[in-house]
Amino acid sequence: MSGDAAALWPRVAEGLRRDLGARTFDHWLKPVRFADYCALSGVVTLETASRFSANWINERFGDRLELAWRQQLPAVRSVSVRGGVAATERAATLASVPLPTFDAPAAPAANPALLGFDPRLSFDRFVVARSNILAANAARRMAMVERPQFNPLYLCSGTGQGKTHLLQAIAQDYAAAHPTATIILMSAEKFMLEFVGAMRGGDMMAFKARLRAADLLLLDDLQFVIGKNSTQEELLHTIDDLMTAGKRLVVTADRPPAMLDGVEARLLSRLSGGLVADIEAPEDDLRERIIRQRLAAMPMVEVPDDVIAWLVKHFTRNIRELEGALNKLLAYAALTGARIDLMLAEDRLAENVRSARPRITIDEIQRAVCAHYRLDRSDMSSKRRVRAVARPRQVAMYLAKELTPRSYPEIGRRFGGRDHSTVIHAVRTVEALRVADSELDAEIAAIRRSLNS
């Protein structure tokens, strides 16, 4: 019966194109493919490559899809569109395995989606610039080199900067280069839940065996194990066993290992033993190139240069925020037939701009601190260690971390090329002093008020 329904999809699509118009249909529904029809439930399942597209199609065209299908097949009760990796769940039946372990097939040219990976998150689609070149190059080496000189690889950045993209890219390239390898890609939260479930279910041996069978373990968002002592202990043993066996480990987190308060020292030592690569906030050039790369894959969509420049100017904190704004603009234009221009962007993305507006810059913080303590601006970058200069400099570093999205290495560079560990020390020192020294706490509060005024 599924085959009969599949044969109807071209007719359904033709009717939708006629009803919705060629432009809207071609942009949203042309990439959709028939997946399945269950005669028992009356549910038609369609597939598209993007979760974003799937969500929009379900929300905006769900009723139209059901009506179009019922005109061809009256038994249809509902239509569902799924996107991303869900589109290949038929070929990668992983539900029976508690941990998402992916065994690459023998064919070197296997489709990454069939392994449970998102083929869009590849190295080819990761735009490289100064802010992320260390992390990108290290990730490529981890995926391809027979014996990487650094292991584990620790990627850290704020949210939406591309850490998960690099994890997926590593997994896909490693699977292509090592067809018989076992790859595990999971979040630290998933590791914790699986560990707790194995303990309660008396299945620890199977849990340990699955993890230790990995040739490549990729662990996302390590900060989720902060304060989870038993999970950290098991993770430490897992890492030790993998490293001893010559296996590869890649970890991501939202901060450097030294700032993971609540994580056991031995685990931090293991994670710091390879390479710690920071991804900084994206510069203007990188943000523009990301937009143009996205648009190059959509030749039917026209976005003027002044709109691209406006997006680059107003969405500076992270890539996810930028792509979200672009998606919203493209979706509105596709669904309403509106022409994309600067006026439309300013109107439809006004709320996004308000939430994305950069709070304060490091330059502004340095100026405010120097004004408060009557220092010269050069003191922020100087090597002078006298207390009258060193303490205000620490306060400025602390405020830079509190009030901007900049990473520790980036802040250090803005303070005379100081190492990220110096910035970490400054932040911790000022945090402690604010509790113990009410006068300093009041001074910092006054500086913050001046910055917000």
Swiss-Prot record:
Residues 1-76 are annotated as: Domain I, interacts with DnaA modulators. SUPFAM superfamilies: P-loop containing nucleoside triphosphate hydrolases (SSF52540), TrpR-like (SSF48295). Residues 116-333 are annotated as: Domain III, AAA+ region. The keyword Metal-binding does not apply. One of its GO terms (molecular function) is DNA replication origin binding. Residues 334-453 are annotated as: Domain IV, binds dsDNA. It is found in: Cytoplasm. Residues 76-115 are annotated as: Domain II. Coiled coil: none annotated. Signal peptide: none annotated. Keywords: ATP-binding, Cytoplasm, DNA replication, DNA-binding, Lipid-binding, Nucleotide-binding. Belongs to the DnaA family. Domain I is involved in oligomerization and binding regulators, domain II is flexibile and of varying length in different bacteria, domain III forms the AAA+ region, while domain IV binds dsDNA. Oligomerizes as a right-handed, spiral filament on DNA at oriC. Plays an essential role in the initiation and regulation of chromosomal replication. ATP-DnaA binds to the origin of replication (oriC) to initiate formation of the DNA replication initiation complex once per cell cycle. Binds the DnaA box (a 9 base pair repeat at the origin) and separates the double-stranded (ds)DNA. Forms a right-handed helical filament on oriC DNA; dsDNA binds to the exterior of the filament while single-stranded (ss)DNA is stabiized in the filament's interior. This is Chromosomal replication initiator protein DnaA. It comes from Sphingopyxis alaskensis (strain DSM 13593 / LMG 18877 / RB2256).
